């Protein structure tokens, strides 16, 4: 899990528009978010992880215990119930359950690169982050 710890910057995004559309995110919010290059900080303390995302649109901090469901707020202000599990030392999976959609977010670290795969139904987006 130590590979996650540190600061990361979005380098490339593929098909986030498709995921946002599948989630019903308002088009004005999509237009604002489309060109953002947020920075992320991952911290780990025992079985708890904190993920902080900073962009010009929003700063969001999420702290969770692996394997325990928690109330979460998405970037577009939807309330969901999330559970994050450790798949391996360099891979975690988050499942967000909302009233209308279930979103799967897989984060996997290889070296100085993190690939985040977001799936809503049959729509998939891939974000690539680079360690700073």
Swiss-Prot record:
Establish whether keyword Hydrolase is in the entry.
no
Q: Where are the transmembrane segments?
A: none
The UniProt entry, under Gene3D superfamilies, shows: 2.40.128.20
Single GO molecular function: lipid binding
Q: Per UniProt, which keywords does this protein have?
A: Acetylation, Lipid-binding, Transport
Keyword flag Electron transport: no
Domain of life where this protein originates: Eukaryota
Tell me where in this chain the PTM N-acetylalanine is found.
2
Q: Which CDD domains match?
A: FABP
Q: Which family does it belong to?
A: Belongs to the calycin superfamily. Fatty-acid binding protein (FABP) family.
Name assigned to this protein: Fatty acid-binding protein type 2
């Amino acid at each position: 899990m130590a590979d996650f710890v540190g600061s990361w910057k979005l380098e490339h995004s593929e098909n986030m528009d498709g995921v946002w559309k599948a989630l019903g995110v308002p088009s004005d919010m999509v237009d604002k978010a489309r060109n953002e290059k947020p920075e992320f900080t991952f911290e780990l303390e025992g079985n708890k992880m904190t993920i902080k995302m900073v962009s010009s649109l929003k700063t969001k901090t999420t702290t969770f215990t692996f394997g325990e469901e928690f109330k979460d707020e998405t970037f577009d202000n939807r309330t969901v119930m999330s559970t994050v599990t450790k798949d391996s030392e360099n891979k975690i999976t988050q499942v967000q359950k909302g009233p209308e959609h279930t979103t799967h977010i897989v984060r996997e670290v290889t070296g100085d690169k993190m690939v985040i795969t977001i799936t809503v139904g049959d729509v998939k987006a891939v974000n690539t982050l680079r360690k700073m």
